[in-house]
């Protein structure tokens, strides 16, 4: 008598974990992750060692201590991480035709997407955590306390990293080639949106509340006490006449809401596009 053995397929959650694990292994094999962490740690060590070596004492305030180290490079680091781990996450499956091996498996496309995004999420959390907690702990050793403002900035940086990754996945799900997705993501976050923020806000007088990079300004503004506020200044120009400049300051509560909105909307749209996208073309 023949015995039929049926094998139960893993649940969606188990498959998400599997995709996440293999995606992280892929980044380890390509040395992207190791390279990012090495660059991050070397930069952090330099930022900690150079000031006292050139005769500049550390700030005595724990918030200023952390801000003096993290504020210059936080958003740049996040943009680099998003470019490396989110921008080509989907498009590379089509460009390299690896989707022919991946997509026929009994795994839902949304499961593949969520597994990949979870790996990027974990990498972003790791990178931002190292970037913040080394100076936070160093500040504890130097000043004797930990600033709650530094913790709040850390939380905002995490949220921005996840939101920027979501935008990167959306771009990756649309673009045909990985190079185009990488270039567009990098310049969108580092140049295009910030320039747009300046034109619309500083010169146009309209607060760019829709902009992810504008709301990311709260990462650094949160260190200031009291928290800064928006203002308008009028400057006389040679030859007569005045020029008005607007300085808009994003509010923390609004920034959190906008970033969460980016995370939800960008991922939902990206999943829909990814599910409908075919290998041909």
Predicted feature residues:
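Short helix-to-coil transition segments within interhelical loops
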Residues: 101-108
């Amino acid at each position: 008598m023949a015995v039929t053995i049926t094998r139960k397929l893993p649940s969606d959650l188990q498959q998400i974990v599997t995709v996440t694990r293999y995606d992280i292994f892929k980044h380890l094999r390509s040395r992207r992750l190791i390279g990012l962490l090495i660059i991050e740690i070397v930069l952090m060590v330099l930022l900690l060692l150079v000031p006292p070596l050139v005769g500049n004492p550390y700030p005595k305030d724990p918030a200023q201590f952390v801000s003096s180290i993290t504020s210059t490079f936080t958003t740049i680091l996040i943009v680099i991480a998003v470019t490396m781990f989110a921008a080509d996450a989907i498009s590379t499956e089509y460009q390299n035709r690896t989707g022919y091996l991946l997509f026929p498996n009994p795994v839902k496309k949304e499961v593949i997407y969520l597994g990949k995004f979870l790996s990027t999420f974990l990498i972003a959390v790791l990178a931002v955590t190292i970037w913040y907690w080394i100076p936070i702990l160093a500040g504890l050793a130097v000043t004797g306390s930990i600033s709650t403002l530094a913790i709040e900035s850390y939380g905002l940086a995490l949220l921005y990293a996840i939101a920027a990754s979501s935008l990167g996945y959306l771009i990756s799900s649309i673009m045909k080639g990985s190079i185009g997705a990488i270039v567009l993501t990098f310049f969108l976050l580092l140049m295009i949106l910030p320039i747009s923020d300046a034109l619309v806000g500083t010169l146009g007088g309209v607060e760019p509340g829709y902009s992810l990079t504008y709301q990311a300004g709260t990462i650094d503004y949160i260190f200031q006490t009291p928290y800064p506020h928006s203002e308008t200044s009028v400057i006389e120009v040679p030859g007569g006449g005045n020029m008005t400049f607007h300085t808009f300051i994003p509010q923390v509560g609004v920034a959190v809401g906008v970033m969460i909105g980016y995370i939800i909307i960008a991922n939902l749209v990206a999943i829909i596009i990814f599910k409908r996208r075919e290998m041909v073309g």
